[in-house]
Amino acid sequence: MSATGATAPDKRRLILNAAVRVFARQGFHACRVSDIADEAGVAYGLVYHYFASKDEILDTLFLERWKVMLELIREVDAQPLPVREKLGAIASFIVDSYRHDPDLMKVIIVEVTRAANSFGQTHLGQIREAYELIGEIVVKAQEEGVFKVEIEAQFAAMAFYGAIEQMLTGWIFGLLPEGEEHFERAKWLVVETVCGGLETSAVGEARVG
C-alpha cells in the first residue's frame, strides 16, 4: 500500500519509522520535520497532523519502546526463575532489540538516555523506573542469599544496565564487532560479569563445583 493510500494508524507508523531512520542518520538536532516527511513520502503538513513537533516524535519513539522493556522486566521478575535467568532474559531483550532494529536503539541511546540536559532529563522518571525494577530483582536475590548484601542494589542495577548500554554504544559507534555470535556472547558477558561479582562465595563455589 502506498503512503497516500495508507490508513491513519499506518500513516502515523510510517512517519515514526521514517523518523527513526532520519534521526539515526542525521541526528535529532540536525534534521527538520520536512526531512521526516520526505523520508516517509508524505506531505509536510501531514506530519503535524499527528505530531506537534519532532520533539513529540522522539518522545513517542522512546516511550513506546521503553514501555515494552519495563513490561518485560516486570513479567520476568514475576516468574519463579533463578536471578541469573532473570537478568539473562532482560539482557537478551535489550541486545535483541538492537539486533532487530539498530537504528531505533541508536536513537534511544544517543538522543534520549545519554542526553542528560534535554530528553534524558525529561524522561528521568521512566529511566529511573528501569533501574528500580532491576534493583528489586537484585534485592530478592540478596534476601535469598544468592547475592552479596554489602553491594547496594541500586549500584548493582546501574552496573547491569550500564554494562548493556556500553555494549550497545560500542556497536553503535563501530567499536565492537557485530553478528549473531557476538550478540550472544555479549549477553553472556554481561550476566557473567555482573552476577559473578554479586554472587556470594557459597553460590560461586557451588557453581564452580
Question: What is the role of each PLM region?
Answer:
Residues 1-10, 21, 202-209:
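N-terminal intrinsically disordered/low-complexity leader segments
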Residues 3, 14, 22-56, 60:
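Helix-turn-helix
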Residues 3, 61-89, 139:
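Amphipathic alpha-helical linker/stalk segments
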Residues 11-19, 36, 61-69, 134:
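Generic hydrophobic, amphipathic alpha-helix propensity
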Residues 67-70, 74, 100, 118-144, ...:
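Amphipathic alpha-helical packing segments from all-alpha helical-bundle domains
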Residues 69, 88-109, 135-136, 161, ...:
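Helical hydrophobic small-molecule/effector-binding pocket
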Residues 99-118, 169-173:
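Amphipathic alpha-helical segments used for helix-helix packing
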Residues 106-108, 121, 150, 176, ...:
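Short, hydrophobic secondary-structure boundary micro-motifs
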